[in-house]
Amino acid sequence: MDEQKRPRAWVYARIPGDYDGTMNSYKVCSMQALHDGCDIVGGSIDERDGWLLRPGYRDMLRQIKAGKVDRVYICRMRQVSGKERHLYSFFKRLMQHGAQVTATEYSLRDRVNMFRLARRVERYATRKGLQLPW
């Protein structure tokens, strides 16, 4: 594959209070990104619970906004947030900047379809003419 055509990936991991689990999650996501033919251009971890104390998450969003990331690798949605409004905001940011997200533990498309969140994201994508983030 042409080096310049390879998707640029960001790896993000967060399991509050579990450093070893967070690092294992990061490794699994990194291996999946490489297996999928991506160039890993960056990554971040957050060890804390809550929404405000997450510099790794904010760094990832800055890179997405700057157009430096094509795909984000996570193990599961809960690593981003357990709150639907935060996930919706995350998915919107990805769509606005043409990035996608891959979850290594399950099919993200199948998982979000189990919740109201999928319909909200699909309506937003249709209204704005954007590609879905998964």
Question: What do these predicted regions represent?
Answer:
Residues 1-134:
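Short, structured surface patches at the beginning of a domain
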